[in-house]
């Protein structure tokens, strides 16, 4: 059984490595630096299966430089972004993936267009790119399995509910939360328990998912006729869905003949961490 090495780079993803502790090794890296850790580990031992967990505040901002080079180098790993369009630590500040037309829960306008990470991943050379919704298990689980089995850089953008800071009618990424204010010195937050939101709809169709506050999340699933090996078509479909105010989900792009970083660098078949010092540094002779 192939082991899994998991690196999570956000304080809110700190539990992620624990989910894979059966025949796996996991640790947390500095925020925005998960790709560096994964690259070093993967180059030292290519026999492991590498899974990295990130967020939109990480991969689209402080860690965007590392995300860019991790994708273009075709590191053999699965890179997951848990995307909710907001920063929790700064109480609902827009992240770079928040849509231009989306207002904050305080009524503030978003002044900048969003960064679409799947489009960027395709343009950078990622050989497997997909987007899904955390409430659509039937679609998400197969995509995760396919990403983990793909040779090369696999990227998954997963629209993930924020239960606290992005659940209001003017948000395009609305989620279940309630916040109560009072005039006392302390202003406690109250997050009620709610029923998990799931959906199931056919390929090639779209659906509006009602959220707990009455707002709607519009999803569109790729059809059977869609060709995921066409890079230009993939980017065009993503942009068209953005224009229509929809979130395109499914396998957006895949290169079945892609080379990974080890092939590009012509690294030895024997893992570097199993070599002797004389093999790693043979000297000038």
Positions of PLM-derived features:
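Thiamine diphosphate
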Residues: 14-86, 141-142
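Glycine-rich ThDP/TPP pyrophosphate-binding loop and its adjacent helix/strand module
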Residues: 62, 66-77, 82, 86-228
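Single conserved hydrophobic/aromatic residue that forms the stacking wall/gate
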Residues: 1-8, 12
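Short coil/turn segments at beta-strand junctions that form active-site/ligand-binding loops
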Residues: 6, 48, 152, 247
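Short glycine-rich anion-binding loops that position phosphate/pyrophosphate groups of nucleotides
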Residues: 13-14, 57, 161, 256-257
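ATP/nucleoside-binding phosphotransfer catalytic cores, i.e., glycine-rich phosphate-binding loops
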Residues: 217-285
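Short beta-strand segments
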Residues: 10, 53-54, 78-83, 157-159, ...
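N-terminal cationic-hydrophobic initiation segments that often serve targeting/anchoring roles
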Residues: 40-42, 71, 148, 239-243
């Amino acid at each position: 059984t192939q082991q899994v090495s998991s690196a999570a780079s956000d304080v809110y993803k700190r539990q992620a490595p624990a989910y894979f502790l059966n025949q796996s090794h996991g640790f947390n890296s500095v925020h925005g630096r998960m790709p560096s850790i994964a690259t070093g580990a993967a180059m030292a031992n290519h026999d492991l299966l590498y899974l990295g967990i990130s967020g939109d505040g990480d991969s689209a901002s402080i860690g965007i430089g590392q995300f860019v080079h991790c994708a273009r180098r075709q590191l053999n790993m699965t890179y997951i972004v848990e995307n909710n369009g907001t920063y929790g630590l700064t109480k609902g500040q827009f992240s770079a993936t928040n849509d231009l037309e989306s207002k904050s829960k305080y009524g503030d306008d978003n002044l900048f267009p969003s960064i679409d990470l799947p489009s960027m991943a395709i343009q950078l050379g990622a050989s497997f790119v997909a987007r899904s919704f955390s409430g659509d298990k039937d679609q998400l689980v197969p995509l995760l399995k396919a990403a983990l089995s793909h040779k090369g850089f696999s990227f998954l953008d997963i629209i993930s509910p924020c239960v606290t800071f992005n659940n209001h009618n003017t948000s395009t990424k609305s989620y279940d939360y309630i916040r109560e204010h009072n005039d006392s010195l302390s202003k406690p937050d109250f997050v009620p328990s709610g029923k998990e939101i799931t959906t199931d709809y056919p390929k090639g169709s779209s659906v509006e998912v009602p959220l707990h506050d009455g707002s709607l999340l519009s999803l569109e699933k790729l059809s059977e006729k869609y060709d995921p090996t066409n890079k230009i078509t993939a980017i065009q479909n993503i942009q068209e869905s953005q224009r229509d105010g929809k979130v395109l989900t499914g396998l957006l792009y895949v290169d079945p003949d892609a080379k990974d970083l080890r092939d590009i660098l012509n690294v030895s078949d024997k893992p570097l961490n199993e070599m002797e010092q004389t093999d790693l540094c043979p000297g000038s002779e």
